[in-house]
């Protein structure tokens, strides 16, 4: 017998005795006595492990343990533990439909409600009693509603509204010494019958449980398949239309090229020909008759319609979602069952993620904030935020998803930053959750988005998050792409701060080792953040020296031969930083500056991954989502809309240079997507442009900047020239002003700009004179370029482009252009 085969048999022997015992147990259960006796004899004859007769006894011992837990929680008045035991161990067909079980449950609810009043005189816990009264009232409105027409229970529906039940004549019986023992006896008899009723053999139980799980999984997959087919049909229709438009556009373009060639040869284009081309061009977007009735020969008509067809339109007549009773919502989030908590957290998140971008979503968010959904201003010992520490995994996950949704929006981040306990909770959760859990992914994403705010950056650095991130990234093969992207982008954000660089300098060799290994990771999306982190920390002389000892330049040269020219140019910048001989002047400490310098000025982006892989699926006829909120929690005038702070428009960006402001993956992806020639590099924005849709990506918004790197490079004129000249395709010899100078000559930027997406800091309140020109007309079709380089000043580490004072009027005006 081979070693491999014997090893396999040895592994099987460990469970063989259990399997044989289960077969014997099932034969006896089915009254196959003769077969069972023959089976046992053959087991002995073949020398198999002795059959265990502990199947029933093990089951009995488990029942006894459950029975004792019921009694213990009853005697201690622990209604939460008792409720979990009741829901888990009493079969649904008995719990929901058996009259005896329903009546017993009603009296048990009364017992747990008045339990605090039965404590020794003078030690009554009024707050605990109020909490239990709220729970009892919820029970009366839900499961207890079925007994509301029963005379026996009718008086108890007034219990929540009686100030002192102990002295009320209707409830005197409840406080007699005999009432509680009698109820316990009834409960014991019920449990004895109910728990013993399940005498199913383990083999049959395994079969039934497996079938039940498969059935539920099949139902869930069928729902997902139906939804996927619906989305697929929609996308197929859209694709067909886009394909037809594309083919039409190619044909029109070919004709226009022919016309241009004919014009060059001196042949004139007739108005009828132009009219025909324009009718074909617009036939897909309007009725044929309408297209033919327009006079496209009039100068400007066709071009105006083309610009109008791509101009973002503000949504019109978007209905606001109904107001909610937030007080009732918050109570049920604290006192309801775990399933109700999860359903409410899911519904609240969906209200935020599935609302339309613009006024509808702004109103939802402001309603959450103004009604203090996460109980920022509550003095209670336990708040909604504590659900992140709930024992139930789904509740924890859905709390993290909701916090992540808040963090995806600028005002949401502002609200979260005002909750002192939030950051410690998230950091604790990050370090205790399992690596691949969805909860940890959402907590990490929320922290990454909060790192756009300076106060949160400082707190994360103080709490040692940099060390934890580096340790996690050292084992990057065990991380999902989602976790990897957020972890490295969060690390980069923290490394932009002075204190963050100092933390990295404490373990410079280890940090550099981890970052250089990530340069070769198969996920190229993370390269931008790795390069940004390297560029930032290499500004510290101690880290530069350590990098030189590690032969960092040779390592970087190995990664400078890839097909991606943007990443290659970034590597060149890092090498220049590594070889910089100039010791930078003492940088001002940035960690204690005011929040007005937060890098949190991007448009809101609600990522699609917030609603991915929903583990909670509603049961048949169970309310969920918006229907749950509007059916059970309808309120009056709780939607308080206020003017939303406008985010600053994207400004001129050089994408060849390292990221120098805190970023999040989605906005960076939006930035580099624009570098492929799809969008102008810089452009003016109309008032309505804030309503334009943006692609849903992995995360929330992320700012980035180029000005601060220019300011850093200003100390080295060679690096300054390289930073401006590199990557501007077709214009390597254009005049570049020296640092600190400005020029009125127009710089012609040709080609596309991609790579280290970064942009200058823009004041939150732009100068009215400087901004008036940009708001006076709609965005032009052609790109508009800055008339001057940004004015250089002393770089403040981590704030990306801000100086000790505000940028000059000329600089901010050119940035907005």
Curated annotation (Swiss-Prot):
LisH domain boundaries: 15-47
Annotated Gene Ontology cellular component terms: centriole; ciliary basal body; ciliary tip; cilium; cytoplasm
Matches recorded under SUPFAM superfamilies: ARM repeat (SSF48371)
Transmembrane segments: none
Region (Disordered): 580-605, 610-629, 642-817
InterPro entries on file: ARM-like, ARM-type_fold, ARMC9, ARMC9_ARM_dom, ARMC9_CTLH-like_dom, ARMC9_LisH, LisH
Outcome of gene disruption: Embryos with CRISPR-induced armc9 null mutations show curved body shape, retinal dystrophy, coloboma, reduced cilia number in ventricles, and shortened cilia in photoreceptor outer segments.
Ranges annotated as biased composition (Low complexity): 805-817
Bias-annotated ranges (Polar residues): 692-715, 740-750
Tissue: Expressed in multiple CNS regions, including the cerebellum, all periventricular regions, and all layers of the retina.
Domain of life: Eukaryota
Keyword Nucleotidyltransferase in annotation: no
Keyword Magnesium appears in the UniProt entry: no
Biased composition (Acidic residues): 586-605
GO biological process: cilium assembly; positive regulation of smoothened signaling pathway
Subcellular location: Cytoplasm, Cytoskeleton, Cilium basal body; Cell projection, Cilium; Cytoplasm, Cytoskeleton, Microtubule organizing center, Centrosome, Centriole
Keyword terms: Cell projection, Cilium biogenesis/degradation, Cytoplasm, Cytoskeleton
PANTHER family assigned: LISH DOMAIN-CONTAINING PROTEIN ARMC9
Role: Involved in ciliogenesis. It is required for appropriate acetylation and polyglutamylation of ciliary microtubules, and regulation of cilium length. Acts as a positive regulator of hedgehog (Hh) signaling.
Protein name listed in UniProt: LisH domain-containing protein ARMC9
UniProt source species: Danio rerio (Zebrafish)
Gene designation: armc9
């Amino acid at each position: 017998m081979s070693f491999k085969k014997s090893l396999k048999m040895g592994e099987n022997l460990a469970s063989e005795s259990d399997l044989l015992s289960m077969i014997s147990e099932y034969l006896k259960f089915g009254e196959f006595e003769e077969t069972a006796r023959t089976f046992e004899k053959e087991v002995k004859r073949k020398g198999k492990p002795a059959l265990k007769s502990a199947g029933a006894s093990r089951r009995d011992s488990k029942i006894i343990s459950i029975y004792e837990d019921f009694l213990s929680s009853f005697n201690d008045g622990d209604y939460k533990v008792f409720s979990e035991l009741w829901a888990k161990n009493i079969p649904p067909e008995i719990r929901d439909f058996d009259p005896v079980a329903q009546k017993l449950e009603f009296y048990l609810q009364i017992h747990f409600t008045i339990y605090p009043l039965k404590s020794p005189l003078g030690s009554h816990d009024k707050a605990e009693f109020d909490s239990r009264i709220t729970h009892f009232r919820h029970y009366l409105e839900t499961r207890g509603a079925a007994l509301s027409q029963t005379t026996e229970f009718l008086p108890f529906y007034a219990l929540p509204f009686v100030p002192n039940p102990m002295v009320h004549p209707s409830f005197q019986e409840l406080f007699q010494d005999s009432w509680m023992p009698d109820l316990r006896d009834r409960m014991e008899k019920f449990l004895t019958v109910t728990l013993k009723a399940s005498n199913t053999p383990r083999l049959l139980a395994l079969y039934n449980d497996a079938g039940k799980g498969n059935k539920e999984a099949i139902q869930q997959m069928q729902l997902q398949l139906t939804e996927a087919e619906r989305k697929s049909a929609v996308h197929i229709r859209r694709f067909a239309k886009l394909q037809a438009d594309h083919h039409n556009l190619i044909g029109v373009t070919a004709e226009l090229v022919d016309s241009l060639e004919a014009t060059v040869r001196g042949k004139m284009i007739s108005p009828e020909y132009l009219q025909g081309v324009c009718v074909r061009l617009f036939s897909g977007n309007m009725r044929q008759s309408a297209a033919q009735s327009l006079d496209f020969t009039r100068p400007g008509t066709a071009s105006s319609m083309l610009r109008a067809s791509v101009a973002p339109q503000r949504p019109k007549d978007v209905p606001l979602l109904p107001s909610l009773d937030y007080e009732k919502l918050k109570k049920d989030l604290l006192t309801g069952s775990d399933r109700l908590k999860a359903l409410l957290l899911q519904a609240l998140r969906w209200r935020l993620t599935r609302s339309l971008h613009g006024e509808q979503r702004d109103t939802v968010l402001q309603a959450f904030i103004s009604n203090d959904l996460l109980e920022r201003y509550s003095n209670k010992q336990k708040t909604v935020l504590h659900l992140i520490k709930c024992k139930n995994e789904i509740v924890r996950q859905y709390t993290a998803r909701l916090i992540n949704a808040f963090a995806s929006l600028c005002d949401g981040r502002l609200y979260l930053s005002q909750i002192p306990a939030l950051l410690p909770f998230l950091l604790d959760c990050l370090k205790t959750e399992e690596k691949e859990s969805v909860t940890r992914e959402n907590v990490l994403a929320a922290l990454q988005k909060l790192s756009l705010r300076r106060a949160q950056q400082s707190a994360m650095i103080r709490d040692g998050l940099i060390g934890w991130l580096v340790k996690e990234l050292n084992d990057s093969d065990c991380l999902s792409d989602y976790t990897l992207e957020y972890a490295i982008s969060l690390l980069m954000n923290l490394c932009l701060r002075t204190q963050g660089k100092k933390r990295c300098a404490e373990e410079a060799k280890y940090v550099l080792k981890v970052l250089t290994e990530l340069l070769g990771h198969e996920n190229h999306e993370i390269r931008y953040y790795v390069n940004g982190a390297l560029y930032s920390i290499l500004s510290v002389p101690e880290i530069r020296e350590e990098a030189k000892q590690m032969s960092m330049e040779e390592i970087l040269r190995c990664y400078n031969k890839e097909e991606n020219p943007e990443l290659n140019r970034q590597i060149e910048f890092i090498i220049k930083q590594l070889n910089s001989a100039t010791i930078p002047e003492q940088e001002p400490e940035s960690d204690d500056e005011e929040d007005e310098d937060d890098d949190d000025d991007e448009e809101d982006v609600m990522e699609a991954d917030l609603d991915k892989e929903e583990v909670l699926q509603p049961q048949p006829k169970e309310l969920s989502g918006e229907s749950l909120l509007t059916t059970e929690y309808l309120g009056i005038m709780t939607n308080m809309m206020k003017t939303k702070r406008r985010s600053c428009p994207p400004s001129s960006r050089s994408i060849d240079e390292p990221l120098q402001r805190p970023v999040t993956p989605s906005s960076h992806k939006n930035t580099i997507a624009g570098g492929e020639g799809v969008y102008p590099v810089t452009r003016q924005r109309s008032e309505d442009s804030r309503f334009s849709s943006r692609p849903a990506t992995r995360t929330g918004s992320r700012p980035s900047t180029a000005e601060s790197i220019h300011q850093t490079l200003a100390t080295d004129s060679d690096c300054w020239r390289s930073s401006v000249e590199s990557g501007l395709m077709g214009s390597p010899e254009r005049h570049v002003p020296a640092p600190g100078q400005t020029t009125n000559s127009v710089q012609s930027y040709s080609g596309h700009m991609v790579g280290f997406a970064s942009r200058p800091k823009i004041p939150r309140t732009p100068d009215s004179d400087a901004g008036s020109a940009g708001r006076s007309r709609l965005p032009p079709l052609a790109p508009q370029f800055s008339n001057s380089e940004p004015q250089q000043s002393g770089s403040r580490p981590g704030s990306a482009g801000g100086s000790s004072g505000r940028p000059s009027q000329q600089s901010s005006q050119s940035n907005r252009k």
